[in-house]
Amino acid sequence: MKLLWTSQHIKVTVHIDGKVSKMDVLEAIKTRRSIRKYQDREVPEELIDKILDAAMCGPSAVDERPWHFIVVRNREMLEKIPEVHPYGAMVKDAPVAIIVCCDSSLEKIPGFWVQDCSIASQNILLAAHSLGLGAVWTGVYPLEDRVEGIRRLFSIPEHVIPFSVIPLGYPAENPGTRDLFDPDRIHLEKW
């Protein structure tokens, strides 16, 4: 069995034949935080490939897999994102951003692409965290001004909807973890 990668941040070892020797997914979920400050350090292409592989491993309605991803490393383009996204200031300091998009021509069940792209976005965040990177989800859809701004900036065709922009890089901050479990939000059997 040939080793593909190992994470030092969560207990994950993946081998080329697809077998996982150990994994602590709950730790990744509970310790992932939104990271908005990044070190001035490039993210290797192989890590981006692993992150995108994880994004595409998410479930999707009737397996339509409507997602497309734009990987942005060009500094000039990264610095333009906050001009069309009011909450995208952190993108200017990130070495890379991934724009998650939906190709509406791939839709089999109208509207379910939002769930599919949400899952892909969450997988990007978790995969980045597991690889020692920090990331933050900045929403684009459903706000039309953001959708049109990102579409225009990246020459995205009309049938493709930009869903989220996820800047990522090596963290330059550690916001710590916190317990978000709230039993008051749980209802048994009925509301």
UniProtKB/Swiss-Prot annotation:
It comes from Methanothermobacter thermautotrophicus (strain ATCC 29096 / DSM 1053 / JCM 10044 / NBRC 100330 / Delta H) (Methanobacterium thermoautotrophicum). Its cofactor is FMN. The keyword NAD applies. Keywords: Flavoprotein, FMN, NAD, NADP, Oxidoreductase. PANTHER family: IODOTYROSINE DEIODINASE 1, NADPH NITROREDUCTASE. CDD domains: nitroreductase. This is Putative NADH dehydrogenase/NAD(P)H nitroreductase. GO terms for molecular function: oxidoreductase activity.
